[in-house]
From Swiss-Prot:
Identification of the protein by name: Uncharacterized protein R329
Taxonomy, superkingdom: Viruses
Length: 177
């Protein structure tokens, strides 16, 4: 498979989760537990804003961080302040990329470059799509942290794929009615 085919396939998979992630952003809030251990992941509960019912609970990890003021992208594997349980999958993604051959040099360079400048907003989506495709975790939640009227995005991997797939099917069914 060519690099452009891999990117296209990754973007299609990543984009297919957009309605579910958008639903979570608009209709839920979350409560959670942040780990202080290398062996236990942080967890979030997504709670519906209107009913206060827990929709699902999930373990999480951080995939990447993006700061819009400086247009700086950083993979979580390069974040020394994170526990192993917070960026394990990103480290696995890095190890995978390091083994890629010359024919995949574009993807290899994206994944193995710890920090980079984003010149076009679509590059954020491409990075997320490639990363989520490699780790086979398509649900990436953008947690936004305000910094001096700018945004610091933490791209959080939601690991309860089974519950998210159920929610996605439910939302698709509702939109088709």
């Amino acid at each position: 498979m060519s690099v452009s085919d891999i990117i296209s396939k990754s973007l299609i998979e990543y984009d297919s989760t957009t309605p579910t992630i958008q639903y979570l952003i608009e209709n839920t809030y979350f409560e959670g537990y942040k780990t202080n251990s290398d062996t236990e992941r942080s967890r979030l509960k997504f709670i519906h804003k209107d009913t206060n019912k827990v929709l699902f609970e999930t373990e999480i990890e951080t995939l990447a961080i993006y700061y819009d003021k400086l247009n700086i992208w950083s993979w979580s594997w390069s974040q020394v302040g994170l526990y192993n349980s917070e960026n394990y999958l990103a480290k696995e993604m890095l190890l995978y990329a390091l083994k890629l051959g010359y024919d995949m040099s574009y993807i290899k360079s994206i994944i193995t470059t710890s920090r980079g400048v984003i010149r076009d907003p679509i590059q954020v989506d491409i990075n997320l799509a490639i990363g989520s495709g490699i780790i086979k975790q398509p649900y990436i939640y953008p947690y936004v942290y305000e910094v001096e009227k700018r945004k610091l995005y933490y791209y959080i991997i939601l690991l309860n794929k089974q519950e998210l797939d159920k929610l996605s099917k439910k939302l698709n069914k509702q939109s088709n009615e």
